[in-house]
Every structure is written in structure tokens, then in C-alpha cells.
């Protein structure tokens, strides 16, 4: 018999299980829990939104409402920085010019300003420049000014009694309504000189007939008291080549003779049926240089002309005069530099005998830099301070203040270094003899900054920074001191909007603002200005500074084109905390580019070892350093590798042309396009003083000149777009450079464009032409950076198959 058992759950039939599942009651929803969860989610979301709002900077909220910087802005009054051109004339007074044009005298002790010249008077005379006589009785105005080179000009001059006198023309006795090359007051009373046809005229006071005191001038050939082209551009860096003694009794002047210097002819294509030419003396590498001599004439009594004797040194067979400065009323300091520019001698010359005594000698295996520096003297002339390069360890020499003290009954001077360290003194400003202090600008803070310092000239030479943290958003300064040293004018040049303030020297306290350029601050605040970043890159044991300009709306997730801007003239500085609004600003603000600059080997203010690295091999190391800067930027995710460009002008044009064909790490093209403005392409075609300074004397060993030709580089140009811009009447870098370059580009079948400016000079004096120039450069890079839509192309064969 079989016993019946109760079936187990596992033994249930599939049908029974399905019936149970189907027939079971659904669970009740937990509505209360769902509501709580939703509430928590809403609270979290609101907290996130609140955090985002609170943490977002206020300026970002309004950024989209701000305007972008345009080319028009660069030339508008809103962006025009006003420099009051303040100048101390006594212990407590300075002269300055207001924005509306009125010239005033300000007394810092009484805090009272007096009108000297009404702005409307300057307007009525159409005057470009003005100068007040030392006795404040007369003003000298120039009008109808016509530029010659970078600094020089000709113009008509009038004298007018302050404040409301009628203008009277300033002319040589033999000519009326003459266009003068120069006119300016002396240090005392109403004495003045002017230069006409390269001859010097002296007037003891207004109303007295001028007398010609130097008459050896010959137009375009022999210059008295003025620079020729080479001295103006490369040596003295000014058109003025005369110097008053402190008491006004003597005048030192240079005579520059161009008679043996080859002539360059600048063509003028417009304005006549046949082109005309403007000839002028321009010494190229290896050619005859101008000769120079220094003379002193007495202005009281019969004119006596005495030449200062150059050093009796075989290394000085050919020389430049790079600096002249009066020490006393009878002693004048002169720096003589040999043609190779590797030996300089500082002398103190007796203006009554012409005998010059050597005070200091400097020599370099490369070249001597900063030879225009003026020493600062004590009142008796026995003590003076000058800047010289002093060894500071592995980075080579840096420029520091040396004090020289003449010993009684001894031909040897006692020399002491006032400053030291791996930073540069950039300028000596003043010596306070009573307080035993020297005032100067330096890069001690950072190479890209200029701060105002003082140092004791006795004891342990303690120094103090006077400008550090003194003015908000300002780290780049220049300054000038009152005659008593009790007050100083402090000029902020960046990174904020430039301004001028007046301070008490004792406690650095700001007394008042002279100029704040509020209109520019407002314009800047209303625009999408670039964000500025600084960083260092390491190359061959050097830390090289780099400046990066990013759009105001920058985000890491956007891809931006990269524009490398190069200058790199040996000893120059591209990375500096100075205020600037330029066409590069427009590229960043309006067109979303990232602009980068780098101070590589050959740049200044980082020691002579780095400076002299480029000797006899210009372009080679600069290319390496600039390419490293580009590679550093290409590692950033926000840079578009397919849109990289380079630009340079003058020497920078040489570098941009040199760098453009450079290959990347994978041997592909790095740059999409490049542009060069007035590029140097062959240094034997350029100014003797410049080329010979860095490449040696042409004719002795020309290998450096051959190696640095860009012709060797442009053959590697492939499909990159290349824009060359050059004015045809460029007096500094002749169009010949571009003509030589284009010849090589045609041979190499390169893709280039040329834009010329007929009959325009190197410095583009016309604002309308400058606007056109900037637009041309910007449009070229905007087109280069344009992202083209790549549509699939259909070949003829495929077209036939479809048919």
C-alpha cells in the first residue's frame, strides 16, 4: 500500500506557481518616502545653484556686456594716455601740461599752481612743442614740424613773452621765416641756441641778434650739434649732439663728418611724373663710418673753439662717442667706444685745455652693452657714480653702481661698488650729496619690473625700495627728483593705467595725484581686456620669462589659436609689466587669439652670460628658445595646434622669417602662417654699428654674416602663408632687404604676399597709415586662423559613376 505525502513547495507544478504569482496582491507605494527624497534633491540642487552664483566673480556676470577692443579704440581719445611731461625747475616747483593743453607751474610747498601758457594759445599757434625759458619770462614754440628720422625734425619756431605776448619768429640774421633743425634754451636766463643748415647760432637773450658760433656745417654731410642718421639711430639714440655747461658759459658740441660715408638713395614714386630720390649717408657693415670730434666753445666774449682730445690708444683708431656729460663748468665727461664696440674708455676732459684724463676702462670678449649711461657727479666733480657690469656668479655680469672718488695729489681714483646682486640697475636718477644717498631704478624685484630705490653712499651702502607697494597695480616706474631732493615725481607705467604722483622723499608719502588718466581707466573697464599671465620655461640651465595674453572670456575647454610675437633685439626686453593697448590686444579681445612673448637668449636684464650667447650666431639660439615657448604652449589643451602663427618687426621681422620654417617634434610644420614688418634679411645690408656689434667687423671674418642670412632658411618654407610688409622709403631697414628676400622666396616657390606702403618712412608717422597697417596685420591673422568647413569633395570619376 502506498502512503500519500503532502507535496513540497518545490514540487508545485509550474502552472500552480504562475497562478500564485499572477494572483498575488501588488505592494503599496511609499508616497511619504518619495516626497522626502524629492525634497532632498530640490534642496541639494538649490544649494548647488546658490554656490555657483556666490562663487562666480561679479565681473564675469557683466563680461558679455563689455565691448571688445577694436582698431578704432587704439586711435581714440578714450585710450590716449596723457603724459603731463612734468619737469622740475627748482627745489619745490615743476612745470607740467594739463590734458586740455594749458601749461602750469606747481609749487609743492604752497600747493599753488600758476598758469604759464593757456592751451588756446598753443592751439592758435598750431604748436607741436613748447619750452619755457629758465627765467620763466618767455616760451619757445615749434610748429609745422616735419619728421626726418626717428627723433629729428625741422620746424618753424616763435618766441612769445609769458603769458600773453605776441609771437616773434626765430631766424638766423641772414634769413627770414627759416625752417630750423633745432632750437632750445640754455640753463640760465634767456640764452638759447638754434641750428640752421648744420651751423650753430647763439643768442644771449631774447631781442638780441643771434650770432653764428659754429660755421663749418654742410647740409647732409657735416653736422654740428646734431646727429647724422647713424648716431641718431644707433649710437646717441637722439638727434641732439650738443651739451650746455651747468653755468651756461660753454657749449660742448659734436662735429660728425659723413663725407666718406657711402650714399643711400630713397626713391619717391608718387607726386611727379618721374620718380625722385632722397640721398643720405648710410654706413653699412664694413663700409666707411662717419668721423666724429668733440668741441667746446666759450659763449662769453670772443668765440674760442677747442677740440677735446680722444684717447691715445691703438684700439681707438676708429671710435664712436657714446656719452657726453658736464661734471662741472670746466670739466666734461666723455665715453669713447672703439668701432668693434668691445673697448670703451671714460675720460674727464678739461674744457679749457682739451686734455682728457682716463677715469675708467671697460673691455668685453663679446660687445659692450649700455654705453649711453650718464654718470652723476658731486658739485665739485671729485666724486661721481656710474653704471658698469660687475661679475655676479654663474649668470655672468650684472649692471651696478660704482662710486669713483678722486684722491688729492694722486692720479688714481678710489673705486667702490655701491650695489651688487643678480639684478640690474637700469638708471641712476639723482645723488643727494647732503643726505649721502643715491637714487636709482632697478630690477631687483623681478627682471620685468622697475622699482625706485635709494642706497647710502657711506657706511654699508644700505638700500631701500621707495616704490614697492606704494601705488596699487603698479610695478614699473620712472621718477625724477626736485633740485633739493626733498620731493619726487613718480611715474607709474604699468601694469595698471599710467599715472603720475608727487611724493615727499623723507617718508615716501604721496602728496597728490598729478595725472590719473581716469578716462582711460573707464575705457579699460568697459572693454574685454586680455588676461595677463607670466611663467618661466627652463632651457639649458636658463629660466626664461614668458608672457601670455588670454581672452577675457577664456575657458580651458575652448581651443584658441596661438600667436607668437617676437622682438629679441639683443639687450631688449619683451616681457615687462608695462601698460599697453596694441593691435595684439585687438587680436586677443576681438578675435580670441592667445598671444605669447618670450625673452630668450640675447635679451637684456638677465645677466651678460645670457645676453652674449647670441654673439656671431644671431637667430640660431633665439629660434630654439622661441620654439620651446611654442612647444610649452602647445602642451596646453586649450591651444589649437592647427592654428599657430608668428609675427615680428625690424629685428623681430628677421626672427619671425627665420623661425617660420621651423619643424615641430614630429618634423611637421609648427606654424600655419607668419608675418614680418620691415624685416632685416642680410646683416651686411644693415647699419654698421648694429651689425658689427653682434657679428664682428665685416671683412675680417664674414662667416657669421653668411650664416645669419635668412635666404638659407626660406627655402624650407612650404605651404605656410607668409605676409611681408615694408614701406618703400624705409630709411632704417631699406626695402632692399625685402627685395632680396622675395627673390629667394620666388626661387623656392614659397607662398607669400607682399604689402608695400609707397614713399612711407620706417616709423609710420601718419595715424591713418598706422590704422591701415594694423588692420592689414589683423586681417591676415584672422584669415589664417579661420576654421574652414571641410566638405567632402566628389571626384570626376565618382561623378561619372553616379550618372
From Swiss-Prot:
Homodimer (in vitro). Interacts with KCND2. Identified in a complex with KCND2 and KCNIP2. Forms an octameric complex composed of four DPP6 subunits bound to the KCND2 tetramer. Interacts with KCND3; this interaction modulates the channel gating kinetics namely channel activation and inactivation kinetics and rate of recovery from inactivation. SUPFAM superfamilies: alpha/beta-Hydrolases (SSF53474), DPP6 N-terminal domain-like (SSF82171). This is A-type potassium channel modulatory protein DPP6. It is a single-pass type II membrane protein. Keywords: Cell membrane, Disulfide bond, Glycoprotein, Membrane, Signal-anchor, Transmembrane, Transmembrane helix. GO terms for biological process: protein localization to plasma membrane; proteolysis; regulation of potassium ion transmembrane transport. Disulfide bonds join 349-356, 465-468, 474-492, 673-784. Residues 55-803 are extracellular. InterPro entries: AB_hydrolase_fold (IPR029058), Peptidase_S9_cat (IPR001375), Peptidase_S9B_N (IPR002469), Serine_Prot_S9B/DPPIV (IPR050278). It is found in: Cell membrane. Its main location: membrane. The chain crosses the membrane at residues 34-54. N-glycosylated. Residues 1-19 have a biased composition (Polar residues). It comes from Pan troglodytes (Chimpanzee). One of its GO terms (molecular function) is serine-type peptidase activity. Belongs to the peptidase S9B family. Gene3D superfamilies: alpha/beta hydrolase (3.40.50.1820), Dipeptidylpeptidase IV, N-terminal domain (2.140.10.30). Glycans are attached at residues 111, 257, 342, 409, 473, 504, 751. The keyword Signal does not apply. The keyword Disulfide bond applies. Residues 1-33 are cytoplasmic. It holds the Pfam family DPPIV_N. Regulatory subunit of Kv4/D (Shal)-type voltage-gated rapidly inactivating A-type potassium channels. Modulates the activity and gating characteristics of the potassium channel KCND2 amd KCND3. Promotes cell surface expression of the potassium channel KCND2. Has no dipeptidyl aminopeptidase activity. One of its GO terms (cellular component) is voltage-gated potassium channel complex. Residues 1-24 are annotated as: Disordered.
